[in-house]
Amino acid sequence: MAGETTITVIGNLTSDPELRFTPSGSAVANFTIASTPRTFDRQSNEWKDGETLFLRASVWREAAENVAESLTKGTRVIVSGRLKSRSYETKEGEKRTVIELEVDEIGPSLRYANAKVNRTQRNNNQGAGNGGGFGNQGAGAQATQQDDPWAANSSASAGSWGNGPDSEPPF
């Protein structure tokens, strides 16, 4: 939503993401991120851990399925989203309110790991927000050389000015 404050949290997943489906069929993945600030103590010449923040998070739809398939317990992640409060009642009738992170973007941190990213084929065009990469191509669209402005031009007669060392620039 426009105007809402987003935050970014870097931390480790405390368990594998839990994937569920709503009665209407929407996927949701829930997980907890543990983020511990570290500071360097010059007197003792060592790193000191601060108090760990445990933050519950949820991600929806296709991203939820991608998270459940890709991320596991202990994975260091970078998560961006919006804080939301949610109230509920326990089995004992006590009213509780929790603060959770509604995830907009999530990915593995490459600081201490590497990853090979595989782009998924989209089944339908219900992507809300920035899902799907450059240009939000829908319904399994494949980027062709014609659609890709950065692709090398294979035909020399396409009107480009870089046709050799003696060609004149268009200006």
Swiss-Prot record:
Q: One GO molecular-function annotation for this sequence?
A: single-stranded DNA binding
Biased-composition ranges, Gly residues, are 128-138
List, as start-end ranges, the regions of compositional bias called Low complexity.
118-127, 139-164
Pfam name, any one: SSB
Q: Which UniProt keywords apply?
A: DNA-binding, Plasmid
Query: What sections of the protein cross the membrane?
Result: none
Region ranges (Disordered): 118-171
Gene Ontology cellular component?
nucleoid
Q: Name one GO biological process term.
A: DNA replication
Q: Which residues form the SSB domain?
A: 1-110
The entry describes its oligomerization and partners as: Homotetramer.
Q: Which PANTHER family match?
A: SINGLE-STRANDED DNA-BINDING PROTEIN
Protein's name in the database: Single-stranded DNA-binding protein
Q: Tell me what organism the protein belongs to.
A: Paenarthrobacter aurescens
